[in-house]
Amino acid sequence: MDGAMGPRGLLLCMYLVSLLILQAMPALGSATGRSKSSEKRQAVDTAVDGVFIRSLKVNCKVTSRFAHYVVTSQVVNTANEAREVAFDLEIPKTAFISDFAVTADGNAFIGDIKDKVTAWKQYRKAAISGENAGLVRASGRTMEQFTIHLTVNPQSKVTFQLTYEEVLKRNHMQYEIVIKVKPKQLVHHFEIDVDIFEPQGISKLDAQASFLPKELAAQTIKKSFSGKKGHVLFRPTVSQQQSCPTCSTSLLNGHFKVTYDVSRDKICDLLVANNHFAHFFAPQNLTNMNKNVVFVIDISGSMRGQKVKQTKEALLKILGDMQPGDYFDLVLFGTRVQSWKGSLVQASEANLQAAQDFVRGFSLDEATNLNGGLLRGIEILNQVQESLPELSNHASILIMLTDGDPTEGVTDRSQILKNVRNAIRGRFPLYNLGFGHNVDFNFLEVMSMENNGRAQRIYEDHDATQQLQGFYSQVAKPLLVDVDLQYPQDAVLALTQNHHKQYYEGSEIVVAGRIADNKQSSFKADVQAHGEGQEFSITCLVDEEEMKKLLRERGHMLENHVERLWAYLTIQELLAKRMKVDREERANLSSQALQMSLDYGFVTPLTSMSIRGMADQDGLKPTIDKPSEDSPPLEMLGPRRTFVLSALQPSPTHSSSNTQRLPDRVTGVDTDPHFIIHVPQKEDTLCFNINEEPGVILSLVQDPNTGFSVNGQLIGNKARSPGQHDGTYFGRLGIANPATDFQLEVTPQNITLNPGFGGPVFSWRDQAVLRQDGVVVTINKKRNLVVSVDDGGTFEVVLHRVWKGSSVHQDFLGFYVLDSHRMSARTHGLLGQFFHPIGFEVSDIHPGSDPTKPDATMVVRNRRLTVTRGLQKDYSKDPWHGAEVSCWFIHNNGAGLIDGAYTDYIVPDIF
């Protein structure tokens, strides 16, 4: 059979928003208007280029907040030649894929989940060819995406089936399922079927389709609920999908939303099944607690423009919504730290008006004293214990907004974390809001987690004001503080987080665990908390008869969902905890999370899924991967791959190597190690050597604003002469970009991406292009590699091979700076300090001890130095022969030229 793609292929795209978005390639033509349900519709051809979607179904089963989704689509190719189908998937970041399968010609091709270390081998092979194997990620605010292209045989059909799972989170007093429907093509059988089972009973259920006229929505959306069960069915006919009576385009273009909540007549909602339990805690009819809240706001120069405008708009609205019993203050931090009052004041009408005037009037500063701003806000809240005891029963909250990294005062992230942790001491939660993409979000997440809060990214968009208000609305009404949920110690073998600093109106606390054998019947939960003016205490017992009844009604699904809910929450918590522990404990947590991911068949940041029996033109299997916040996804660059079933695999092809234009004159370090500094302002070059012992690690580039760094470790000759200084060279380089958790370790033997995360290992025999969240690495076979950082610099590592039979010398590396103009003014290091203009004057040129190398007097940094004119080699363009560079040589390890002594640049680690 012919596996070639026809002139036009069908594109079937499935996007998931919170749950799933479905999208297919548009049919020819465009809609001219919305249809009216009363208009008579004509039969139309639903095929595009001989391919039509026979069915597209989303089946969602929810059992006690645990949602299990199966998305099935069948595509039929009626053409006499093969067609290409692209299956694009966007899933919420909170979801775990558990299955993906493709069925064609009676054969099933099933996903196989493995640990990611094993899957890296697949990544490596795909990267070497400069293409992708279904791994390209394009994440939106809450989404993750992958794409699989498949060639479909003529006169045949193919069925895709995706399964994924998640725990629904309660916000604003309801659970919400949003499905964005956008087929752009008429579907013979389109269906969304949502089945809900909640043991507490369903108190409300609604379903809406923003894209349907009200009359048509009433005809096509069927919704019902009674007792424990709820059901929503959306099954429009082909004629009901048409955008106009004679159109072949679809009006299914918008959000399909299902919202529901459960009955809260009983405070206790405790399920026990199959030696696992799930406890849902969301008591009603509690009095809102008064709160003490301090807003800590970044007013550095980078906030100018829309950011500060939107921040002010949000603050004005938030202040207007505060209750008279609340107390508050505002702290602003730039280069300096200033507070509005310096202590908590009541949210009276006069104070709120004055605070709003303060917000309207503040102006921006320059740098970012994040540490100072946070400590000032913490100090204000801590005063409650010392000087305002009447406010000690309020719920205290600290909210910080920043759009960048610390650049003033304390800038070391580990020290800031320690300072904040020691100052808060567990008294109240810290919520960090990271505005835009230039913020170190992992840093904010760790800080929030260490202090009983959470971090949220605010996207730089037209709705940033609403994003800020939306976050505040979630924490605006605390009902309980210090919520402690306890279970019998002799009965519980494993437990998710059971202590929460605060419980807010409209939310829900979920705890799950594993129970020892024979302990189910006596299982109970004790809850203690502090409320407004009173203590909260309750004991929940398992109702055995009710559980038996539930098991009869829902059977295996209830047992299975309670256990998988526990596994889901446990894995999520283990992954989060990894961010704030040392390397040894991180490895232990990773091992636990990996084993659970494999046991329960979840695609998590530690696992990947490949599809057996499916391959592309180079024999690669498609791989489904889930990126994590602390280890961004690897993206292979190049043309997309089209996968075919095992019977249709064409012969392998090879991609061309990647080339990159290099500047005429560069700054770098090479050979023994000779530092070459090009000074464009003088149209001249300086050079110096560093004489140190093998094993020493030197800081070459360090940008404190971004954390970007390059360190190099020296190696010596294989055979060393006693009592003599033998040559040293760079044998290991570490390039790190903490903003994206990027690390690259380079040696003359291997190139390792993210070595701390078990990343892929490439050899110098590979030709590869890889991208990780704004960093592109190009490996040019047996020659060099180029690292390009968005909003940063471009750097080259040159490989030097020596004669294989040499008993003295060994392979080494050179490092060159190709572009540094976007690096910050604070960049330092043996090379980095010269990214900025440097002034010097040369005079009194006269013959030196070597007639071919004149000496001279150089005045630099207010020092007079004796320098020598000489030649060095630049290997950035020609790694084998190099090009001679004439330079002024500064003696004694660059003394007088470099800032401080060369020993100041010795660092303990490669990263």
Swiss-Prot record:
A motif (Phagocytosis uptake signal) lies at residues 181-184. Changing Q595R: In allele ITIH1*2 and allele ITIH1*3. Residues 37-166 form the VIT domain. Residues 1-27 form the signal peptide. It comes from the Eukaryota. The modification Aspartate 1-(chondroitin 4-sulfate)-ester is found at D672. The modification Phosphoserine is found at S129. This is Inter-alpha-trypsin inhibitor heavy chain H1. The lineage of its organism: Eukaryota, Metazoa, Chordata, Craniata, Vertebrata.
